Regions:
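Active-site environment of non-heme Fe oxygenases that use a 2-His-1-carboxylate facial triad
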Residues: 51-53, 57-104, 109-323
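Motif-centric detector for short Cys/His coordination patterns
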Residues: 1-88
Length: 323
């Protein structure tokens, strides 16, 4: 039962009201309406869940486990074995819970053949296609159309912030990592946002309320993509919904002159906190690891690596959270 509304609710007048009402023996509320010769029955649990009083709304508790650099001491808590996901629904649920509540999970002991991550990813759903192809190859190439395809260090960032709807999840499958350098970093941007909300509210409010432009120019497609979005977006309950942030692709500031200075300072502060050691964890991906995370919560980066000292090859995949 989809519970989709089949009748035209717009034909119900704005002045409709209960004609008679009573509580039945099973606890349900019975209402006879003033028009339409219709009687409704409401379960008390449904009424409580949909009660819109301020007192009821204050009961909301965030499901997210916010974390900082202290997670470095317990990286095993975000690890799960590849075969556990493949062979059991319990393993799949554990993986999904890590992704949803903590925003990060490292799948261990996956095969290291090209495209082999698709099997475990399909335990969740199908991947999302982009112009980077699936999978996209994270390797050092001579003429890259993205900074990821170089040996340079990458500051903590989300992928594709210039998309209208950036991918919800990202998966980086390590095939080879023998080069010197190339260690990974991650930061819970929800935790950084929460720090600002509790300690620097003026900056937090600017990041929530001021849309800025993100832009990408891709020579391989002769295309320019851009979109406006706030660095922090919230749910109706005031919880964290999305982070949209990448220093590399944040375009020239485009806001009212009266707030330009404060907007610049707010983004400067946010960017610095997203790289602060007190919020960041660091680790090295080993062949067979799949670094999986909420792309609209967790920012990721890497240190510079020496392509002459060995090889580094990751395959990347995207997936929408709706899936």
């Amino acid at each position: 039962d989809s519970r989709h509304r089949m009748f035209n609710i717009l034909k119900v007048s704005e002045d409709i009201n209960p004609k008679n009402y009573s509580v039945k023996e099973d606890g349900k509320l019975e209402i006879e309406w003033s028009e339409g010769d219709h009687t409704s029955y409401y379960d008390p649990n449904w009424l409580r869940e949909n009660c819109y009083t301020i007192k009821n709304k204050q009961k909301y508790v965030s499901p997210y486990n916010l974390w900082d650099s202290s997670l470095q001491k317990n990286l095993k808590s975000i690890q799960i074995d590849h075969d556990e996901i493949i062979n059991s629904d319990e393993g799949l649920v554990k993986w999904l819970e890590l992704l949803h509540y903590t925003g990060i999970a490292i799948v261990k002991n996956a095969p290291i053949e090209k495209n082999s991550a698709l099997k475990v990813l399909n335990r969740i759903s199908h991947t999302r296609e982009t112009f980077f192809n699936t999978p996209f190859e994270v390797i050092n190439i001579p003429k890259p159309n993205n900074s990821a395809y170089t040996a340079h260090a990458l500051r903590n960032h989300m992928d594709l912030p210039w998309f209208e709807n950036p991918p919800g999840y990202q998966f980086l499958h390590c095939l080879i990592n023998s080069a010197k350098g190339g260690d990974s970093s991650a930061v819970d941007a929800f935790a950084v946002a929460d720090y600002l909300r509790n300690n620097e509210k003026d900056i937090f409010d600017i990041l929530v309320n001021t849309p800025l432009k993100f832009r990408d120019k891709d020579y391989t497609q002769e295309a320019v993509r851009s979109v406006y979005g706030t660095a922090i977006s919230l749910t109706k309950d005031g919880d964290y919904n999305d982070i949209r942030y990448s220093i590399a692709t944040l375009d020239a500031l485009d806001c009212h002159p009266d707030i330009m200075d404060s907007v610049y300072k707010a983004h400067h502060r946010f960017g610095n906190l997203l790289h602060d050691a007190k919020f960041q964890i660091n680790f090295r991906l080993e062949p067979g690891d799949i670094f999986s995370f909420n792309n609209r919560r967790l920012l990721h980066g890497r240190t510079e690596f020496d392509p002459n000292s060995g090889h580094r090859h990751l395959q990347g995949y995207y997936m929408d959270r709706d899936e």
